[in-house]
């Protein structure tokens, strides 16, 4: 069934997505007759950041529309770019036109932009919620907890939409506590690399660089104050059932901050739930940071909402206890590749176990190639 669905998707998307058609011609693939036929057609993250940086630097938003259209199933010429000032306004206009584009974190200095249709967004949110519930089956969202999350209410990261529907289901009235309401903006992730380019070409001067650095310092100071206030709230609520949703790097930061305040390991309500994600994002952590975090909050595996996913996926692969395995949704076709990412190594059905680079094809994707 998966192979047949992939075959149908390819035949449909090849007519809609210019880059896919070009890739298929270069690879000599005319139909999907085996999973191996998908491999040369897979898009890497670099495809979604293949726009010339000059488009963003020079405010050439019509060109960004055209670029996005080469990777999208639906026409993007309906995105109104009149008076757009920066990348975040372009993303807002795209969403208003039915293109729910989300940005990567842009740690390399150049963000990826992946298109989602409204159907993609709605189905993905439902799938993510189902996976979250599947990983903690003994607990039901009942608006009874003090909820703490690092995710702001607005921004360009895909997980913001998910957190906006996940956490309110658990929060008691008045007990939904965000680290900050400051939006997560693509512009700020891209700005340092952009300034370096513009400085090299003489388009900005030292004064603009100094102003940017002062802005960053002020924001860091504000963030530190927000974090301290957030810790005050967490300490005051620790005797209640909690739901704490953070990335591992922030979780470790919480552990350090509260230990410095004299909070002991396990000094939290025994029914506390947690969810983690995103890795440590370069934070300096000890090798046993996961064990220390769990011990500090006193949580056990069955009280952790856990999954495996990439932002490109529709939904998550829920972690199943007590087997410590992941439930792959039926619309995700896992493909285990060799190190160069060019050859399919086989399937679990063939050998029982396959080890290699993880790739996947998402049958559910509507707004782009899966």
Regions found by a protein language model. Name each.
Residues 1-103, 110-161, 165, 172-214, ...:
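Nucleotide 5′-phosphate-binding alpha/beta core
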Residues 106-108, 278:
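Short, histidine-centered active-site or binding-site loop motifs used for metal coordination
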Residues 108-111, 311:
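Gly/Ser/Thr-rich beta-alpha loop segments that engage phosphate groups in nucleotides
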């Amino acid at each position: 069934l998966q192979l047949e669905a992939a075959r149908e998707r390819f035949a449909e998307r090849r007519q809609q997505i210019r880059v896919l058609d070009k890739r298929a011609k270069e690879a000599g693939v005319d139909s999907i007759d085996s999973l191996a036929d998908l491999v040369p057609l897979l898009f890497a993250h670099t495809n979604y950041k293949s726009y010339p940086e000059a488009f963003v630097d020079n405010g050439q938003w019509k060109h960004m529309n055209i670029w996005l259209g080469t990777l999208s199933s639906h026409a993007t010429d309906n995105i109104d770019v009149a008076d757009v000032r920066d990348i975040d306004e372009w993303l807002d206009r795209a969403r208003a036109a039915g293109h729910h584009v989300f940005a990567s974190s842009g740690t390399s200095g150049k963000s990826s932009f992946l298109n989602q249709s409204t159907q993609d967004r709605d189905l993905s949110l439902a799938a993510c919620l189902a996976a979250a519930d599947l990983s903690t089956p003994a607990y039901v969202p009942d608006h009874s907890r003090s909820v703490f999350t690092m995710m702001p209410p607005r921004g360009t990261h895909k997980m913001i939409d998910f957190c906006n529907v996940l956490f309110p289901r658990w929060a008691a009235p008045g007990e939904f506590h965000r680290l900050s309401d400051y939006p997560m903006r693509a512009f700020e992730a891209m700005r340092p690399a952009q300034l370096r380019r513009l400085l090299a070409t003489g388009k900005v001067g030292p004064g603009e660089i100094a102003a940017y650095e002062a802005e960053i310092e002020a924001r860091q100071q504000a963030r530190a104050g927000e974090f301290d206030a957030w810790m005050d709230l967490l300490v005051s609520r620790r005797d209640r059932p909690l739901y704490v949703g953070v990335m591992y790097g922030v979780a470790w930061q919480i552990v350090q901050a509260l230990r410095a305040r004299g909070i002991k390991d396990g000094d939290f309500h025994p029914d506390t739930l947690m969810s983690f994600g995103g890795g440590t994002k370069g934070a300096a952590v000890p090798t046993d940071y996961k064990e220390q975090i769990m011990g500090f909050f006193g949580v056990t595996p069955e009280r952790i909402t856990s999954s495996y996913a990439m932002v490109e996926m529709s939904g998550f692969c829920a972690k199943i206890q007590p087997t410590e395995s992941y439930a792959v949704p039926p619309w995700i076709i896992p493909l285990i590749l060799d190190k160069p990412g060019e050859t399919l190594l086989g399937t679990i059905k063939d050998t029982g176990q396959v080890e290699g680079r993880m790739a996947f094809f998402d049958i559910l994707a509507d707004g782009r190639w899966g």
